[in-house]
Amino acid sequence: MTKLYIQDVTLRDGMHAVRHRITPDDVGTIVAALDAAGVDAIEVAHGDGLAGGSLNYGPGSNTDWEWIEAAADNLTHATLTTLLLPGIGTIAELEQAHKLGVRSIRIATHCTEADVSAQHIAKARELGMDVSGFLMMSHMTPAENLAEQAKLMESYGAHCVYVTDSGGRLTMNGVRDRVRAYRDILDPGTQIGIHAHENLSLSVANSVVAVEEGVTRVDASLAGHGAGAGNCPIEAFIAVANLHDWQHGSDLFALQDAADDLVRPLQDRPVRVDRETLTLGYAGVYSSFLRHAETASKNYGIDVRTILQEVGKRGLVGGQEDMITDIALDLVASGPVSTY
């Protein structure tokens, strides 16, 4: 089979788990460990991508540029990657990231809004970058519709398009259906990627199913460090890949050491499946909403799960973090709310 392309997202999606607060020194140390462990690419940015630091999404302890520079200084083999959401990051941020050594970028949109990625994908291609389309909250639209959005990103110039399970809501059949729908419509030369979350404890299983269906790019992170219950834990996925004799180039023990020695000590809240993060997956809520919902719960005395259930019912998507407070206030005003 084709060698897998292992992309680590500890220092981008994982930013949500530490409220986007990490020192450049820690970034450099983690990047050096990942590079030595043989991963193919390392993504670095605010959790919401370039220029994501704000009152709405959460300010970062440092700028994207400070983190990216620290990463670039510690890379030898892996490709430096970042993420950009059109409407948050701009062409100017894309160009600056390229100047600092970023050579691969994922352009992320909501799963039904691929058309807003055209400019950014085209610019990244113009700069000679490796470009992926990143269709977030992929559970929110049927497989065939998602594949049509992937086809748009391909037409703009994306080398790869991801099934991005931002809510950790997809089951194995959901992943299988979406990857097959992609393969049916995309050109044979266009790669497919999987970005899984652990909210339903299915991130490794979903990633394995994706690979079995032809996916070659797999997102994962040290200790699963990421939004909600975290991403696919890279050390667990690599262990399973070894059992399947899949080619990948990563060192299992080195990844285990980095996960336990470097990343877990940074977590102010354990990244795991618990009553709150399981509810994210069950209700199909954007994983990065967890910390915002926990803050609203503390401020207004409403169970986090009740808030998350209502977020899921209303179908909130990335960028609507401010509405979580509105939901909490509505719940306070309406009195006791039953759970399901």
Swiss-Prot record:
Reaction catalysed by this enzyme: (S)-4-hydroxy-2-oxopentanoate = acetaldehyde + pyruvate
GO MF annotation: an example: manganese ion binding
InterPro entries linked: 2-IPM_HCS-like, 4OH_2_O-val_aldolase, Aldolase_TIM, DmpG_comm, DRE_TIM_HOA, PYR_CT
Binding-site residues, substrate: R12, D13, S166, H195, Y286
All copies of domain Pyruvate carboxyltransferase, residue ranges: 4-256
Short name of any one Pfam family annotated for the protein: DmpG_comm
Binding site for Mn(2+): D13, H195, H197
Active site residues according to the UniProt entry: H16
Keyword list, A-Z: Aromatic hydrocarbons catabolism, Lyase, Manganese, Metal-binding
Site (Transition state stabilizer): R12
Superkingdom of this protein's organism: Bacteria
Record EC number: 4.1.3.39
GO biological process, one term: L-leucine biosynthetic process
Family, similarity comment: Belongs to the 4-hydroxy-2-oxovalerate aldolase family.
Protein name: 4-hydroxy-2-oxovalerate aldolase 1
